[in-house]
UniProtKB/Swiss-Prot annotation:
GO terms for cellular component: plasma membrane. This is Uncharacterized protein Rv0943c. Gene3D superfamilies: FAD/NAD(P)-binding domain. PANTHER family: FAD_NAD(P)-BINDING DOMAIN-CONTAINING PROTEIN-RELATED (PTHR42877:SF4), L-ORNITHINE N(5)-MONOOXYGENASE-RELATED (PTHR42877). It comes from Mycobacterium tuberculosis (strain ATCC 25618 / H37Rv). Residues 321-346 are annotated as: Disordered.
Length: 346
C-alpha cells in the first residue's frame, strides 16, 4: 500500500521583514490567507509582491479601493525571445494585474521601512497606506515534519536529506518506497503524479514502487540549472521501479577518476550512478564531474573516456553548470565496479 505524507502538503506562507515594522491599520498577512470580512472600499492599499494570484485580487481591489500601490520585486531571470503565442496571455495579465488601470500605481524602489502612516521606500518617498496585502508567495519547507521517518534500508529521512530536501518531482524519495510527499504550493500537479503512480501499481499488480536513485539525482541537478518544465501526466513514470519486494539498489560511485578529453587527461572527482534499463536492456549511467575543465578542450570535443582504476568507459560531457561542474553520461558498462545480479548483464 502506498502512503502520502499529509503533514508536508503545503509550504508556509512567506513573509518579509522590514525595519520598524508597526501596525498601520488592518494589515492583511498574505493573499493566501484572505480575510473575507476585509472591505477595500475607499482604502489606500499596498500590495507587497506579485504572487501567482496577483492577476485576480489586484484587479478586484482596484474596483473599489481609493488607490492600490504595488511594490514589485526586481526580476530574478531575464528571458529573451518570448514566443509570440504568449501575446494574448500577456495582454490578459496586464489587464488583470492593473497595469493598465488608472487606480493602480507601481513602486519599483525597494521598501526601506514601515512607518506609522505607510511605507517608506529607498528613494525617500513616503507612501500613505491604510492596509497592506502580502503577495510574497510560498516558502517551501526545507525539511519534513517527521524527522523519525525510516526508509527501507533503515535510514531516516533526516539522514537521507542531510544536505537538504531532494524529492523527485517533489513527491518521491529513493529509499522510501510506497511513500509520497505533497509539499505544495502546486498540490494539484503533485497529486496527479501520485495518482498516476498508484494507477501504475494497480495495472502491473505491483506491491512496491520506488524512484530510482539515478533519476532523483539527475532531476535535482538539472532543477538547479534551468526553470522546471511542466510535468506531463503521462510522463515521468519511467523513473520508478516496480516490484513485489525490495529491489537491487542503483550502483553509485563517488571518488577520483581520470577523464580523457580531446587527447588530454585530467584527474577529476566524480559522482556517478546508473541503472539497467528494462526497455532497451542497456546500462545507463550519469553523474557530475566536480572539477573545472579547460574551455579549449570542450570546444574541440564532447566525447570523452572516463577511467576509474582499471575500468574505462566511453562518456559524453552533456552540459556545464553555473558552478563550473559538468554533467557526464554514458550507455553500456560503467567505469565503476558494480555488484549484485545486475553486474552480469553488461
Amino acid at each position: 500500500m502506498a502512503g502520502v505524507s499529509e503533514a508536508e502538503r503545503r509550504g508556509h506562507r512567506k513573509l518579509v521583514r522590514f525595519q520598524a515594522r508597526r501596525a498601520i491599520g488592518p494589515i492583511r498577512p498574505t493573499s493566501a490567507a484572505w480575510d473575507r470580512d476585509f472591505d477595500p472600499a475607499g482604502k489606500r492599499i499596498a500590495v507587497v509582491g506579485t504572487d501567482a494570484a496577483a492577476a485576480h485580487y489586484i484587479s478586484r481591489l482596484s474596483e473599489s479601493a481609493a488607490s492600490v500601490t504595488v511594490f514589485t520585486q526586481a526580476p530574478r531571470r531575464v528571458v529573451t525571445g518570448v514566443p509570440l503565442w504568449t501575446t494574448r496571455a500577456k495582454r490578459w495579465l496586464r489587464r488583470r494585474t492593473g497595469a493598465e488601470h488608472p487606480a493602480v500605481a507601481w513602486a519599483t524602489a525597494a521598501i526601506d521601512a514601515l512607518t506609522s502612516s505607510g511605507i517608506r521606500t529607498s528613494d525617500g518617498v513616503e507612501h500613505p497606506v491604510d492596509a497592506i496585502i502580502y503577495g510574497t508567495g510560498f516558502a517551501i519547507a526545507d525539511q519534513v515534519g517527521d524527522q523519525t521517518l525510516v526508509g527501507a534500508g533503515g535510514v531516516t529521512i533526516r539522514q537521507a536529506w542531510d544536505d537538504g530536501m531532494e524529492p523527485y518531482l517533489g513527491v518521491a524519495v529513493h529509499g522510501f518506497p510506497n511513500y509520497f510527499f505533497i509539499t505544495g504550493p502546486d498540490t494539484a500537479a503533485q497529486a496527479r503524479c501520485v495518482v498516476e503512480c498508484m494507477k501504475l501499481m494497480e495495472r502491473t499488480a505491483s506491491r512496491r514502487i520506488e524512484v530510482r536513485r539515478s533519476s532523483q539525482q539527475v532531476f535535482n541537478e538539472r532543477a538547479q540549472l534551468k526553470p522546471a518544465q511542466p510535468h506531463r501526466q503521462t510522463g515521468g513514470l519511467e523513473a520508478f521501479d516496480l516490484s513485489s519486494a525490495a529491489t537491487e539498489d542503483d550502483q553509485t560511485y563517488d571518488g577520483a577518476a581520470t577523464l580523457t578529453l580531446a587527447g588530454a587527461r585530467f584527474r577529476v572527482r566524480v559522482r556517478l550512478t546508473g541503472h539497467l534499463d528494462p526497455i532497451d536492456g542497456n546500462y545507463h549511467w550519469q553523474g557530475t564531474v566536480f572539477d573545472s575543465l579547460p574551455e579549449t578542450s570542450l570546444t574541440h570535443a564532447r566525447a570523452a573516456t572516463l577511467t576509474i582504476g582499471g575500468r574505462s568507459a566511453p562518456a559524453r560531457i552533456t552540459e556545464q553548470t553555473p558552478w563550473g561542474t559538468h554533467s557526464v553520461a554514458g550507455v553500456g558498462p560503467p567505469p565503476y565496479a558494480r555488484s549484485g545480479p545486475a553486474s552480469a548483464t553488461t
